[in-house]
């Protein structure tokens, strides 16, 4: 037992003596080791003999001593930039008393000095932190909490006693540190020719050189404690704060963010260990809280697995953010101004949410470096397989469901509310077209975005920040001031907090963005190309725009932070050959950009070129299509002047990707001389159909990201296809900070939205309002008129019945597919065989179009689909392939020579003399697809085939319905074929269009042939309707869409046989052939013309207003894709009524797909084509498609 001075009298008594500045051990099992405390300068107290004051941006120097005190530098366990001392209750800017140690302040680095030119890759702070010179600390507020006594006896404290709050420093334990027995004789140095100093080691031998080197031991971070002790002004320890408060105060004290002071409110006169002491704690934000935090960029390029780790800096930011949030909630601090996001839905700041999104919410918390190889393998397997050229990315579970897509639609509508109030702007006289009012408004908005005009939008608070006020610190004895709510707060008392990253600022953080451009997301068919062309005419300035690209490029994403190859110093080997080579005399490209680069799908390249030529005064705008393997040198193209000047370069996504891959291979070579598209800066970059880059990991997206341009535009009718991260890719291309940073977008938008946080909708709405303009055809202007006045559109759904033979084939195929699905589902293997199920559904959809399509392979799923064709039903019905062969038995059509010539001559004479269209005896309508019976009576082909099948089902002899003669077999039927002169003028790739016997367009020949049963129900319906259109409008033009090019081949052969002129547009054609096809289709004609077009190649972007009839031959999973196809015709420039016909077969998979679409439970956005939602919803939808959940209603009205 040692003697102790009594706190009251100073006398000694037999008890362990509490030492000044050092903690006494308590009896609650706390750490028994002597832990040196941080040297503390008490607030409002002069009892301390000296204090330590460390400059805010420097570290303590090693070995600085004064008197008997030695300050040694030590790295904090929480953050490698922490100071060695937590200054608690100390004023950093106060005068330094005698004995104070002040470490020298280091100069700011060049990167910090210029940090206001680029936004951080980790947080959207304003410019470099601006801290007023007179700012010392700001009073945040006070709260009442409990403390637990660690002392026994009287005189330690009483109500009103001031207390000093202190924290022990955490220690780092170096496992590999030198043992105590090994002497360290100071730094290594040369003395009298000998090396002395350092830790002595053994002599180096050959064995030790060859021995395996031991990896240096890593520093083990000591367990983080949350003990906060408090003492009286005389230095006697009293107790510690409760765990609840210490949990969030400890980290803030350790990092110097806050300073604490307090006093005792109530306590027992005689303290006992563990008794409760009621305290009042005052909290101040220290000057260090507003210094630059978390701004250090990664010093190395991390691999994928390392990139998933939470770095030490990210951990420190997360702890700081969570601790500040808890502190603000404990004190009751409320923001006086929230961001624009909070204004949409009034909330009590971000503090009221249970838990905000982490800055790196998407990162894995576990370090892969400590995991086993097996765990790493599993991690890789869990990652989605991404193809560079694929359209899908990310987790399939993040696809938006129907409810979420409806929420996105509501966000669009809210973002459109102010669009009708935009001013109208006329384009220059060089633009020949007349813009509609809503297009003039778009020109106003786009021009302001490119000019960077801040007057269009008031300067507002950054969306991630909130504004707060420091409170007035009431000193004891001062009168209590009552603040007036209407009183304008003093600007020096304002501070700002980012609740997402935990950063604090004394400067107003604005939402200004250096990005020049945006997203023009008007609905399809509203003239986005025309509006962009007017902008090209309006803004053609030829002045250097400064280093805008470098200002915005750095803060978007770490993926592209590398210095462009064109700016790096290039070294060339000096050789004799290159010293004597010819000197190029071609003019160099001017130092400032002037050309616009348009990137679009290959099918739209020629259309962009033609539209620009039509809309521009001759010689005002020169455009060039840069496409194909024989592309001209881009440098020479941009260097042209006068008549050779090129203002707009049009290229395709495929060409750009090819150029990008070539540039990546060559840009780092020593002999690289430039000349790539990526070595030049453009005045403007325009992405048409910009949703093509929605996969941020695809090569085409990276190719677009890397382009250099002062202004960037994305044109798309669907900014969000099926994931919120589709929008991120556009923002990243546009260089819009901070949303173009993947970590921020995922943390603040994607994750909260998927977690059904309604505030995430406000974030998305704010983003869209700031950079997106979207109008729809149904919108009205300020006067209540529709902004787009288009002709009416009529959509007709024709529900058809299968023929008897087609029904048998389909039912057989459906039963086989359904049985396999039931077996897989019963075994629990349905989702693991998901691709096989999709292949079965593909075969069913093909069979609905035409049974012959089932015989062909369908891409990657062909082999899986082929298994369905094999026998194995076990019911004696034979092989499906045999059934289709029997159905197609009439495909070998006989020539006219195969028919009896006398019989043919007699019938042809009668047909040639007949002028009126005959009436069918079975349907009482005009005959379609005339068929001649052996008794010379005629009928519709569908009617007589159905009649013969019905008789066979009833075991009756089929006879003529007119005269009763029989029996009649299908082989006895003859078709009546009338052929008109039709040719295809595009290429020789489409044969069979000309009949040498026809000499004029009005010539018609009548022939007899065997009935061609290969024409399916849909084909016959299409031919019948085309024949009706030909009679009503001899100059009609129509589009026939199908997603199966093999079905287009059958339609092509059928049209050729019927003498109907057609053109073809699909993905197998070159860009030149596509352009020629569209040009030919747009020419005037005196006869009907049909364009056979694949849904994928021609469903988006094309302007085909020269047609007004649309036929959709099959049903797609996503109805929006079909609407896009219809909008190729129903768009600006259409002056005729549009008629749309959709063909479906009753009682088949098509009907059920439409029912799912109608009931709003569809597999949204092609989840059946290359993805899945949750397991339960996917299986439920597949069962609906197979017709397993309910009876198929044949009498349903569509």
From Swiss-Prot:
Positions with biased composition (Low complexity): 45-58, 118-129
Zinc finger (RING-type): 920-964
EC nos: 3.6.4.-
Top EC class for this record: hydrolase
Gene Ontology terms, MF aspect: ATP binding; ATP-dependent activity, acting on DNA; DNA binding; helicase activity; hydrolase activity, acting on acid anhydrides, in phosphorus-containing anhydrides; zinc ion binding
Compositionally biased tracts (Acidic residues): 386-395
Primary location recorded for the protein, binned into one broad class: cytoplasm
Domain of life: Eukaryota
Cellular-component GO terms for this entry: cytoplasm; nucleus
Keywords: ATP-binding, Cytoplasm, DNA damage, DNA repair, DNA-binding, Helicase, Hydrolase, Metal-binding, Nucleotide-binding, Nucleus, Zinc, Zinc-finger
Annotated segments matching region Disordered: 1-129, 348-401, 541-564
Start-end of Basic residues biased regions: 104-117
SMART domains: DEXDc (SM00487), HELICc (SM00490), HIRAN (SM00910)
Cell compartments where the protein resides: Cytoplasm; Nucleus
InterPro entries: Helicase_ATP-bd, Helicase_C-like, HIRAN, P-loop_NTPase, SNF2-like_sf, SNF2/RAD54-like_C, SNF2_N, SNF2_RAD54_helicase_TF
Domain Helicase ATP-binding per the UniProt entry, residue ranges: 509-737
Pfam families, per the entry: Helicase_C (PF00271), HIRAN (PF08797), SNF2-rel_dom (PF00176), zf-C3HC4 (PF00097)
Residue sites binding ATP per the record: 522-529
Short sequence motif named DEAH box, residue ranges: 688-691
Function: Probable helicase, member of the UBC2/RAD6 epistasis group. Functions with DNA repair protein RAD18 in error-free postreplication DNA repair. Involved in the maintenance of wild-type rates of instability of simple repetitive sequences such as poly(GT) repeats. Seems to be involved in maintaining a balance which acts in favor of error-prone non-homologous joining during DNA double-strand breaks repairs.
Similarity comment: family membership: Belongs to the SNF2/RAD54 helicase family.
Name recorded for this polypeptide: DNA repair protein RAD5
Organism: Cryptococcus neoformans var. neoformans serotype D (strain JEC21 / ATCC MYA-565)
The organism's taxonomic lineage, starting at the top: Eukaryota, Fungi, Dikarya, Basidiomycota, Agaricomycotina
